[in-house]
Regions:
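Short acidic loop-to-helix transition motifs that present clustered carboxylates
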Residues: 84, 107-109
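General alpha-helical segment detector with a strong preference for membrane-spanning helices
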Residues: 21-23, 110, 144
Length: 151
């Protein structure tokens, strides 16, 4: 009988802003998050009817990432951000994950990261070096995508 008191592995939801992340780095992003726990949810949000999302399509099946459709109903509004935030809150209250990885360089996720941390969740942010400082600081850990790219 094993009496070791190892802490349980953190279950992560990886939520990717498809309008604001690089498809070619999906495998590297998932590998990075897996260092901190088990990834149980992998989603990328965007308007899959737009040409902008075409480059994502080959990376989805290779990395077992679920595409989440969000139509752009109004020009100038980012419906993707709203959909991702709503799903994150649903996951928070569902209680099936202890950690979140928010993949975006968008400061609109700052309040979400703060709220998730207030509830005791571990938050990893992943984005470009140009990511606004408030979002970076709102996360427990922030990984710059430039550091994921192999030379």
């Amino acid at each position: 009988m094993n009496n070791s008191k190892e802490s349980p592995e953190i279950r992560f939801a990886v939520l990717i802003d498809g309008d604001n992340a690089q498809p070619s780095l999906v495998a590297d992003v998932l590998k990075e998050v897996a260092k901190y726990g088990k990834i149980t949810i992998r989603r990328v949000y965007g308007d899959w009817t737009s040409r902008q999302m075409e480059t994502w399509k080959k990376h989805l099946p290779q990395n077992a990432v679920q595409p989440i459709q969000q139509f752009r109903n109004t020009v100038g509004k980012n419906a993707t951000d709203s959909a991702m935030i709503i799903d994150a809150m649903d996951l928070l209250y569902g209680g099936n994950v202890e950690g979140f990885a928010i993949v975006s360089s968008d400061s609109d996720y700052t309040r979400l990261a703060i709220r998730l941390r207030e509830d005791g969740k571990f938050v990893i942010g992943i984005g470009k070096m140009q990511t606004p400082e408030p979002f970076v600081r709102a996360c427990d850990l922030f990984v710059y995508t430039e550091n994921l790219v192999k030379p």
